[in-house]
Amino acid sequence: MMLNDSGTIGFSINGKSFPATAPIVAKRGDWVEVHYMNEGQMIHPMHLHGMAQIVIAKDGYPLPQPYNADVVDVAPGERFTVLVHADNPGTWVWHCHILNHAEREDGMFGMVTALVVTP
């Protein structure tokens, strides 16, 4: 997921702002590997509902001790690799945990996507 907060489109994931972001689709039991890359100028604490993120690498280097994270703080220029065990069927929100990066008065926008886990 390329995270960006600058430019003409504002807060975006992979160059798109919600609702135009593409969901990640996985079958129940799959392992999903996601690479966070913060190309913007602000920190983005990335949060997935319904499942843990296992942080396995930072800036391209495997971690000697991977760890579970509810939120992964991705600072400008940082890169993280996470694994998610897609073991909970449903549609799960995946978003920046800074409220004004993902939500406003008329609903969700910006740094929001979903993980869809099929049975």
State the predicted function of each range.
Residues 1-119:
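Copper-binding active sites and cupredoxin-like electron-transfer domains
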